[in-house]
Amino acid sequence: MTAETLEAIENCGAAEMPIAETCAITEITEAQYWADQSAQRRYRIGQLRSKMEIRQAVIKMAKAGVPQMVKVYQDFVAETNRDIPPTVGSDDAPDQ
């Protein structure tokens, strides 16, 4: 795929466009999309870029004291903490 097509796919991912609509916009078939790992990767990068930008905006508002955003930020922290393995010596560390 061309660099222009991959960029458009990434932008569609950032906008959370469905795959079928992404393919229509970029004028490729769904089979072409699913056969190309770089297209799938760029779509996911677009999604993650938007997720990061939204989180950054939430954090900025939480720091400014917006109560609703403080709660959303706390939910983000809880989600992130589920991804972090327990440290050695913590109560949650698996027995060895």
Where are these regions (language model features)?
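Residue-level recognition of short, well-ordered coil/turn positions
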Residues: 14-17, 41, 66-67
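Amphipathic alpha-helical repeat elements characteristic of tetratricopeptide repeat
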Residues: 2-3, 48-52, 56
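Amphipathic alpha-helical protein-protein interaction segments
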Residues: 52-96
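Short, solvent-exposed alpha-helical "recognition" segments
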Residues: 34-51
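Charge-dense (acidic/basic), low-complexity helical/coil segments
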Residues: 1-27, 31, 78-96
